[in-house]
């Protein structure tokens, strides 16, 4: 079942924001990730692919508690993109949230005001500030990690009014496939908000807990956990990684290369954990 069109709206209406959560074994942070993102969204899809920890019960409970949420259990991650592909061409922003991405809700609400005011009407994609977390205080009042910039920003907020379609082979939502842009838009139409304001003043900022355990069933080094694109994306890259492992050659840790750039810093996280779930 795909997300349908919005009801008929008048010219004074604002864009819809559709949250797109796709997770697998993320029961440590997923509730906080969803609750922080939900006030920003008009509608939020909670999608699970094969979780064996407590993720599914958490998402089902949130789908009942949050009026804008609905739960989907997927047989393959590609279904997450199929659910939203029909939104192309509509006045909709698609906001992808992973189970290890905790946003500043107050900042998101300020960003929503800017979107409603039309500031980003000619923008295809918005990139925000990120702290790639290597340590989180026990009281969750502070965290240490590496900031974007200089790290790569991994936030995913797309203006579907800029495209006619997003089809082709998309292994998961908002990844891969073939994007067909409307006249006047290109893939380069991006706003790098992480370059426009420091972390403390950013309206679009995220704690990315990629170096922390994200599942109660997780063991070993969280930094080596494969993401969906590694499992289902470029087949040649998967073959090369497997071959290197078989012959005992090292495999590049992409998380370190993307998310451990620059100095390690410590920041306050009170804005991200202002209330208990």
Which residues does each PLM region occupy?
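N-proximal low-complexity "stem/linker" segments adjacent to membrane-targeting elements
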Residues: 1-35
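Catalytic-site signature of metal-activated, phosphate-bearing donor transferases
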Residues: 2, 82-84, 92, 105-277
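Catalytic phosphate/metal-binding cores of nucleic-acid and nucleotide-processing enzymes, i.e., regions
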Residues: 24-25, 52, 74-78, 101, ...
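Glycine-rich, basic loop-to-helix element that forms the pyrophosphate-binding segment
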Residues: 33, 75-90
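A conserved acidic beta->alpha catalytic loop
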Residues: 48-59, 76
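Conserved donor nucleotide-binding strand/loop of the catalytic core
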Residues: 60-81
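Short beta-strand-to-loop acidic/aromatic patch adjacent to the donor-nucleotide binding site
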Residues: 91-102
């Amino acid at each position: 079942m795909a997300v349908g069109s919005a009801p008929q709206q008048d010219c004074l209406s604002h864009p819809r924001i559709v949250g797109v959560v796709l997770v697998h074994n993320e029961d440590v942070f997923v509730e906080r990730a969803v609750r922080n993102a939900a006030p920003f969204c008009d509608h939020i899809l909670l999608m699970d692919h094969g979780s064996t920890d407590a993720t599914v019960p958490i998402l089902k409970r949130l789908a009942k508690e949050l009026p804008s949420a609905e739960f989907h259990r997927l047989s393959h991650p590609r279904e997450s993109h199929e659910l939203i592909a029909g939104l192309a061409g509509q006045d909709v922003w698609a906001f992808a949230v992973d189970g290890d991405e905790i946003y500043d809700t107050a900042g998101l609400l300020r960003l929503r005001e800017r979107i409603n005011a039309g500031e980003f009407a000619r923008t295809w994609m918005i990139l925000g500030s990120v702290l790639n977390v290597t340590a989180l205080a026990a009281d969750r009042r502070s965290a240490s990690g590496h900031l974007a910039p200089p790290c790569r920003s991994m936030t995913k907020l797309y203006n579907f009014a800029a495209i006619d379609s997003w089809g082709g082979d998309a292994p998961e939502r908002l990844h891969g496939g073939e994007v067909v842009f409307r006249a006047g838009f290109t893939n380069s139409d991006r706003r790098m908000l992480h370059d426009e304001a420091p972390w403390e003043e950013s309206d679009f900022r995220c704690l990315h807990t990629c170096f922390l355990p994200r599942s109660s069933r997780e063991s070993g080094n969280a930094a080596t956990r494969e993401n969906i694109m590694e499992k289902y994306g470029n087949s040649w890259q998967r073959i090369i990684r497997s071959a290197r492992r078989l012959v005992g050659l090292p495999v590049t840790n992409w998380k370190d290369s993307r998310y451990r750039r620059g100095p390690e810093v410590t920041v306050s996280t009170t804005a991200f954990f202002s209330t208990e779930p």
